[in-house]
């Protein structure tokens, strides 16, 4: 009944039906119930597994007259489920529906029959068990609280790639629990739903043989629990009278992120979880999306694409950099080396922000940042040699030449290296001006400083004898003007 009217979960001497109780989480929950003195009937399809499970569970009995039995039933057949529950010598006090299966795979690579099978094994089996059980349970009104527990999945609140046949039906199971919770008030029956995350079970091991490499990679970030640990968390939630039960921190965050109209079990704590998930989820989602995008590029599923929603940020950042450069202009004329040295960290930080916002996914990571920074340093040396080849000082004022090259590199090599990495095909497209559809205005922003610096070199040899003609002032000014012009034109074209 949730926070305002929760009932305790009584198991001792009660008759409890556990579907999916022959192995995995179902058997672990059944064992917890047996240890509490319950009379447990486990339900599954394979008789040999049921017999082995009953023998194992019987060793945990705490009462001499305690009963542990099994029923072999096809839960995807309503006639079989209804017949089984009707012929039980007792009316179930509690029902734990843990049966189900998961068939992972990419949506387009799964046969349509898989979706039908998942619907039958996960959702319709839940409907059949609940329907037959409630019809019998409503005929009596005991003095103690009764409970129906549906085992769903965290994937009902956090669906990810590879589970398009599984996540939707588990979401349907959760919604079924929401509907039954209110309707079962008519019969004084409590309803709860358990949303566990990854559990080490026989089913999980079988799933791993079917999962695409990407799904295994994404799940490598998750915490994993044994069936016994997950069963213990489930029992704790039942003891508290919770409606939505989770077994780890991500589950608590996501169940509150997607709570909808479900009752609150602990409002203060759950509002806090909801706030944290509201703030954290966009970053976590972007991380997951980035893994998918990178996988798509590596496997050739698609071509890179540029971000289309960063034009305001790009123009704002360009204006900010241009303003800082304008305010530093006198310093550039008076002491070019000091200005270039002191402003370099500013350009580096701003370009890092620009890369993160606009570069094709995946977003900036420490590894990509280091690769881009290393390429920037190497690029600055190459640009220095190019400048020297065109007449820049080699021995005298080489420090000016190098910091001019480093400034050019942070606006050209750094964003490109962080975005294109070591993809030679994309570098060829950039050099041949064919990658605008890939990196958008970044292509123009990279060419802009180069062209601007080239034009900026024109006034240096002229006999005007002006302070701003000193090396490499006009080249730096031209590079910044070229960058600003290219950024504006690039965003307009994009």
Curated annotation (Swiss-Prot):
Pathway: Glycolipid biosynthesis; glycosylphosphatidylinositol-anchor biosynthesis; Lipid metabolism; sphingolipid metabolism. It comes from Schizosaccharomyces pombe (strain 972 / ATCC 24843). InterPro entries: GPI_biosynthesis_protein_Pig-F, KDSR-like, NAD(P)-bd_dom_sf, SDR_fam. This is PIGF/3-ketodihydrosphingosine reductase fusion protein. It is an enzyme of class 1 (oxidoreductase). GO terms for cellular component: endoplasmic reticulum membrane. NADP(+) binds at residues 25, 54, 166, 170, 199. Pfam families: adh_short, PIG-F. A motif (GXSXG) lies at residues 20-24.
């Amino acid at each position: 009944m949730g926070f305002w009217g929760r009932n305790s979960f009584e198991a001792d001497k009660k008759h409890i039906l556990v579907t999916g109780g022959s192995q995995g989480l179902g058997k672990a929950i059944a064992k917890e119930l047996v240890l509490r003195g319950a009379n447990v009937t486990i339900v599954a399809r394979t008789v040999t597994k049921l017999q082995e499970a009953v023998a194992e569970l019987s060793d945990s009995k705490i009462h001499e007259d305690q009963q542990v039995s099994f029923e072999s039933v096809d839960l995807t057949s309503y006639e079989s489920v209804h017949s089984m529950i009707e012929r039980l010598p007792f009316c179930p006090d509690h029902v734990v529906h843990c049966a189900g299966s998961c068939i992972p795979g990419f949506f387009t690579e799964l046969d349509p029959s898989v979706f039908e099978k998942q619907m039958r094994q996960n959702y319709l089996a839940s409907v059949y068990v609940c329907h037959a059980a409630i019809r019998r349970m409503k005929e009596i009104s005991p003095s103690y609280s009764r409970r129906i527990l549906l085992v769903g999945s965290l994937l009902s609140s956090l669906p990810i790639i590879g589970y398009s046949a599984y996540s939707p039906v588990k979401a349907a199971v959760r919604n079924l629990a929401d509907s039954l919770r209110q309707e079962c008030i008519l019969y004084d029956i409590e309803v709860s739903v358990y949303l566990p995350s990854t559990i080490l079970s026989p089913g999980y091991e079988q799933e791993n043989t079917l999962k695409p490499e990407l799904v295994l990679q994404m799940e490598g970030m998750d915490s994993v629990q044994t069936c016994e640990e997950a069963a213990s968390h489930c029992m704790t939630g039942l003891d508290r009278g919770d409606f939505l039960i989770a077994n780890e921190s991500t589950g608590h965050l996501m169940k509150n992120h997607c709570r909808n109209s479900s009752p609150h079990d602990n409002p203060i704590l759950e509002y806090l979880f909801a706030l944290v998930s509201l703030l954290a989820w966009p970053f976590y989602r972007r991380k997951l999306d980035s893994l998918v995008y990178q996988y798509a590029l590596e496997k050739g599923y698609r071509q890179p694409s540029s971000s289309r929603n960063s034009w305001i940020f790009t123009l704002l950042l360009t204006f900010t950099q241009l303003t800082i450069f304008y305010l530093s202009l006198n310093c550039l004329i008076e002491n070019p080396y000091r200005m270039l040295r002191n402003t370099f960290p500013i350009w580096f930080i701003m370009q890092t922000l620009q890369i993160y916002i606009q570069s094709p996914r995946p977003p900036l990571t420490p590894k990509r940042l280091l690769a881009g920074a290393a390429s920037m340093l190497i690029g600055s040396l190459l640009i220095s040699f190019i400048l020297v080849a065109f007449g820049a000082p080699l021995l005298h004022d080489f420090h000016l030449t190098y910091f001019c090259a480093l400034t050019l590199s942070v606006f050209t090599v750094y964003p490109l290296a962080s975005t294109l990495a070591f993809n030679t095909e994309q570098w060829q497209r950039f050099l041949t001006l064919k990658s605008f559809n890939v990196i958008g205005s970044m292509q123009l922003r990279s060419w802009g400083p180069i062209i601007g610096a080239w034009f900026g070199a024109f006034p240096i040899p002229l006999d005007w004898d002006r302070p701003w003609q000193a090396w490499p002032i006009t080249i730096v000014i031209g590079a910044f003007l070229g960058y600003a012009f290219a950024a504006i034109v690039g965003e307009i074209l994009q």
